Amino acid sequence: MKAFFSFVAALVLSLSMAAQNKSFYDFTVRTIDGKEYPLSGLKGKKVLVVNVASKCGLTPQYAELQELYDQYKDQNFVIIGFPANNFMGQEPGTNEEIAKFCSVNYDVTFPIMAKISVKGKDMAPLYHWLTEKKLNGKQDAPVQWNFQKFMIDENGNWVGFVAPKESPFSETIISWIEKK
């Protein structure tokens, strides 16, 4: 009986460790136009993951995000935007409407993914990993509002997050991007 409990404990521990060992690169998401986008294609790049919305007081951050992307995209850095309608209905549009909004209003050229949920029962698997310590191995970081920013290193590891109201040009983000 003792051997059985030891086996079960070892199995639970190994499954827990396997979940923590999952990397950003293990996920595949969909682009705003519906194509599969394996995040493994970003190996070797620092990635800033941001949940975005077009009818939020923080929506002007799109301009800063684009400026940040333009400034660092040639230095193994990329931004990925995930439209989400989780906060007061501030992203009500379809994927097509969101893509048009980003292009017309902010000339966004960084990748925008298909609309997802970033909290609640229908939370996207990637956002479970981004927000749960038991999965990312680092920290619980529930999404507080639109434009929360998650930093992923060149090896697909969770580095940290920046609160929604903080500028994409915050010292935390810039020093992380520029760190060699």
Predicted regions and their residues:
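Thiol-/selenol-based redox modules, centered on thioredoxin-like
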Residues: 125-128, 132-180
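Conserved helix-turn-beta segment immediately C-terminal to the redox Cys motif
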Residues: 45-46, 55, 59-83, 103-106
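Amphipathic alpha-helical repeat scaffolds
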Residues: 31, 51-55
